[in-house]
Amino acid sequence: MNRKQCLETIQLLARITAADDNGYVQCVSCGVIKHYRDGMQGGHYIPKGSSSYWALEIENVHPQCVGCNIFGMKSGAAAQEYTLWMEDMYGREFVQEMLEKRRNPVKLYKKDYEQMYKEWSELIKYHQNRIGEC
């Protein structure tokens, strides 16, 4: 296991966990509703490339449509809407704490990635069963 595999897994986990029993999930930025496998991504509130601290924390990854995640976070209103959603979900103090800790370095080792991957894969299987995919 490596960082890339864990990033892919946590992004899937974020989408499937938020999905209803039919597999549909809502974009936290624009509100569009789609199947978690159809045009939806696990978007990072704090970009994964700028924070080793938050990159693999589930509180930082939530469902976003492709448009909001790829384009809207850089040049559109998606980032502002994501911030409002985060404050509503976790509270303003937690979001401020996230921003303060975003530059804190975290060193992960292969065993850390293996443990995360194993734990998240089990949760994904649970949710696949919940929505009737297994």
Model region roles, listed by residue range:
Residues 97-134:
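Short flanking/linker segments adjacent to small metal-binding domains or redox-active Cys/His motifs
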Residues 48-61, 87-100:
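Short microdomains enriched in Cys/His and/or Lys/Arg
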Residues 4, 51-55, 73-75:
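Active-site metal-coordination segments of metallo-dependent hydrolases
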Residues 32-35, 60-91:
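Short Cys/His-centered divalent metal-binding micro-motifs
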Residues 1-26:
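Short, charged surface segments at domain edges that flank catalytic/cofactor-binding sites
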Residues 26-60:
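Histidine-centered nuclease catalytic patch
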